[in-house]
Amino acid sequence: MAIQTSNLGYPRIGLQREWKKTLEAFWSNKIDEEQFLTTMKEIRLQHVKVQQEKGIELIPIGDFTYYDHVLDTAYMLGFIPSRFSEFTSYLDVYFAMARGSKDHVASEMTKWFNTNYHYIVPEYEEGLQISLKDNRPLRLYEEAKQELGVDGKPVILGPYTFLKLAKGYTQEQFPTILKQLVAPYVQLLSELHTAGAPAIQVDEPIFASLTKKEVQQAKEIYEAIRKEVPNATLLLQTYFDSVEENYEEIITFPVSGIGLDFIHGKEGNLNAISKYGFPADKTLAVGCIDGRNIWRADLDEVLELFTTLQKQVQTKDIIVQPSCSLLHTPIDKTEETHLSTELFDALAFANQKLEELVLIHSALTQGTESISNELETYRNVHHTIRSSAARNREDVKAARTALKEEDFSRPLPFEKRYELQQVALELPLLPTTTIGSFPQTTEVRQTRKEWRNGVISNEQYEQFIEKETEKWIRYQEEIGLDVLVHGEFERTDMVEYFGERLAGFSFTKNGWVQSYGSRCVKPPVIYGDVAFINGMTIKETVYAQSLTEKVVKGMLTGPVTILNWSFVRNDIPRKEVSYQIALALRHEIELLESSGIRVIQVDEPALREGMPLKEKDWDAYITWAVQSFLLATSSVANETQIHTHMCYSNFEDIVDAIRALDADVISIETSRSHGEFIDTLKHTTYEKGIGLGVYDIHSPRVPSKDEMYTIVEQSLEVCDPKYFWINPDCGLKTRRTEEVIPALEHMVQAAKDARSLLKTNA
């Protein structure tokens, strides 16, 4: 039996975020297309070279992208919306789809399964001619072969997952469009096989959550493809969960090998193998290293997994690989020497995970004695972090034990609270507000950098933050917004900011991962018990409120979002970590309220993305996620208005959960998803305060008043005007001042027009 190492995908952004910087330089016309393509090629080949040097045998090719791999697939197959037909060059079309243009909105963006990565949603239009417009995987395969001598493994998004992620068709049209994908996929795979690709990885993550009927549909497509490409080595790759429910059928697919996730789907996949075995004529690709977290593997546990598999599986070949693409992890931990030894030793970023794969390969091919020293080191590291004081705080344990049922609910029901809040806040019909952040200009970022580097004093930095806050309070007053925000100029990131001020968190210097496009985030590391230390937002919020007679919102990030946007310790359940964060935020909210802040927003944009892929597992997650929010927010007075915010989610799955949060007002991304949530509300009622975002903040274009008014009009068909708010989709941190001010002016004017119409109709 042959055993090989493989990787499913490598982080794109570069060790020093060279990828991000190159993209943004190109977008701002600081480099031309030739320089852009040259630099991107250098980065792409460097990533292949690193994996080669680490000893990976099946190196992924084609996982690299200029923006998003789903967008790459859409372009490759001709899924190009007609509104972009005026563009002729590849890059102009590609980036217009991703980012929009002066005259046209971008394609929708949403979360990649239950991760914090965002993909561009493919759009199907009537009359679309589906064909292989560009065999990009072939070009990149040949490039790696010619430039580096690497006979790589092309990676493509599978036809079933691709079409399931697309929009614009009816369910009745789905089977027909799916069949139309056969020809371009046959051409793609045939050309790769002819070029000599030793194996082709076909990603089908959606297989973890298909119905029996859908699996049969998918099988028919693979049979049609295999009939035309009989000799290509196709590796069907699943990840993010088990395929237990459909395993018996999936192992009969006409493919050469099947990749299973034994981290996030370990129990289900092992159960399925135990029950149905594994085909002797197929390769089993074992996802045994966590591709979504940053902790060293438990090598003993991984080797035990292989012992179990080898007793049950008589396959011809085994592949040792991560559970999913390493896109979701930072690149290398070697620069994180500022961390404590116990934490640094416990980490494994992408490059360290590749080394772990090679260690496991050595143990499997040469015996565990060949890595005996490494095994001993790993055992010591795990023991040290498990027994650390940071993970065993008695005060945190006591606070958790003391929780009572009444800690999870507000004293009065929403309707009665809202009446009291209307009296206390004196807001107009259809109040306007923003989501929280204002532009982080070059000056803001530079001043923060100077402060962090000791170039300016704490006092100078605080004066600068106050100056920016006052400037934007005045802007908001002039624009005519009803509920103001302080602008969050002191915050780099909505999760990092709180993590820096809570016990149990640590921070990397270079632990960046891609969120969407060129936007990278540096998730905090929750390594210990989380606890409140001191006030985190009081000073800035109270200062902003002192500048105006209007209401200023306090702005916090919610417990579930902090959890889902962090790298989380894996020694206790996520629910327990979430409750720890909620208790710390509860303390902060009480301080804001006692300081005179009457509206407090607790953002939960990541609530939906944390949901398990399988519907049977949703209830358990939603229960503790909602309870975490309630634990954080339920101790305030009835007159204090609790807001929350969500974005980029499939909200129809969680309308009941949104209702259960019992927030007085929720603001939701609407315009980027082209009104999808408005459609959801046509089939259900939402009887609490709600603001449906009226413009997409991720595009540089300034929408007209009429565009926003149209969304308000559509929203009021499904929402009670008494409870309706008007706001942008998300925070405005990444936009420029000259984009934000006219957009908000248009938004306020749209609100005034809507109020006038309501009064006239009344």
Curated annotation (Swiss-Prot):
Single GO MF descriptor: 5-methyltetrahydropteroyltriglutamate-homocysteine S-methyltransferase activity
Single Gene Ontology BP annotation: methionine biosynthetic process
Record field: catalytic activity: 5-methyltetrahydropteroyltri-L-glutamate + L-homocysteine = tetrahydropteroyltri-L-glutamate + L-methionine
Active-site residues, Swiss-Prot/TrEMBL: H698 (proton donor)
Superkingdom to which the source organism belongs: Bacteria
Cofactor dependence: Zn(2+)
Residues where Zn(2+) binds: H645, C647, E669, C730
Co-factor remark: Binds 1 zinc ion per subunit.
Key words, A-Z: Amino-acid biosynthesis, Metal-binding, Methionine biosynthesis, Methyltransferase, Repeat, Transferase, Zinc
CDD domains found in the cross-reference section: CIMS_C_terminal_like, CIMS_N_terminal_like
Pathway: Amino-acid biosynthesis; L-methionine biosynthesis via de novo pathway; L-methionine from L-homocysteine (MetE route): step 1/1
Residues where L-homocysteine binds: I435, G436, S437, E488, D603
Residues that, per the record, bind 5-methyltetrahydropteroyltri-L-glutamate: R17, E18, W19, K20, K111, R519, C520, W565, E609
Record-listed L-methionine binding positions: I435, G436, S437, E488, D603
Family: Belongs to the vitamin-B12 independent methionine synthase family.
HAMAP family: Meth_synth
Function of the molecule: Catalyzes the transfer of a methyl group from 5-methyltetrahydrofolate to homocysteine resulting in methionine formation.
Protein name (Swiss-Prot/TrEMBL): 5-methyltetrahydropteroyltriglutamate--homocysteine methyltransferase
Organism: Bacillus cereus (strain B4264)
Encoding gene per record: metE
